Amino acid sequence: MFNWVKTAMLMAAITALFIVIGGMIGGSRGMTIALVIALGMNFFSYWFSDKMVLRMYNAQEVDETSAPQFYRMVRELSTRAGLPMPRVYLINEDAPNAFATGRNPEHAAVAATTGILRVLSEREMRGVMAHELSHVKHRDILISTISATMAGAISALANFAMFFGSRDENGRSTNPIAGIAVALLAPIAGALIQMAISRAREFEADRGGAQISGDPQALASALDKIHRYASGIPFPTAEQHPATAQMMIMNPLSGGGIANLFSTHPATEERIARLMEMARTGRFE
């Protein structure tokens, strides 16, 4: 129930932000148009955003014939987690990463890059997929997929605001500075809304993944290895669609300094420390 409340709050917050931007661009008429668009986007996000995200990454569905070891691993972990078997996808990218998507456990999918399968051992890969299945089990995937879709729409609308500026109901330009301000601040606001939920969700998925696999040290080792390898390998698709970054097990976007303040993922060092403490104590709390 709590995850449905979080989903509703997220959709309401992003819808409100969408309407504010619409009002800045076109006054009351712009707010009305933005509301209609936002409602349509929320409907679309719920039913189709998983397919859109998988298409963005050109993910290819695999089965036990085309990727036997990986597919069997996901099936075994799904059974341990008490989940239906999700659809399994591979993404032809060198950057090591993985994510889960879908509106509920019955309509879930997990995806991994070919790079992560090359970099990680089988034990480490089990830790990663257990983490993703924890997202599925706790229905985080609906939240992350919707927020990724809506954040992308906010960025597009903010760019529109910068180009056309602020206008009244008659279409007259009123305050060009306001348009620039919206274009700069709206994506930040959208990122903060995502970040408010995403960081805590990653810690919870680490804990849940450790419970599913029974091996928190494997996930800790995987996170350390992904962190070290990913920094030197570009992930162009993720860079083109930055709103989807929070779906990944590790933030795929390059950059540091101020950019890290708005990261949707907690610090890798802290995640590893928590997992190693679980391994030491045997307590998954």
Swiss-Prot record:
InterPro entries: HtpX_protease, Pept_M48_protease_HtpX, Peptidase_M48. One of its GO terms (molecular function) is metalloendopeptidase activity. It holds the Pfam family Peptidase_M48. Its cofactor is Zn(2+). The active site is at E132. The chain crosses the membrane at residues 7-27, 30-50, 141-161, 177-197. CDD domains: M48B_HtpX_like. Zn(2+) binds at H131, H135, E202. Coiled coil: none annotated. It is an enzyme of class 3 (hydrolase). It is a multi-pass membrane protein. Its main location: membrane. One of its GO terms (biological process) is proteolysis. Binds 1 zinc ion per subunit. Keywords: Cell inner membrane, Cell membrane, Hydrolase, Membrane, Metal-binding, Metalloprotease, Protease, Transmembrane, Transmembrane helix, Zinc. It is found in: Cell inner membrane. Its EC number is 3.4.24.-. GO terms for cellular component: plasma membrane. Belongs to the peptidase M48B family. This is Protease HtpX homolog. It comes from Paraburkholderia phytofirmans (strain DSM 17436 / LMG 22146 / PsJN).
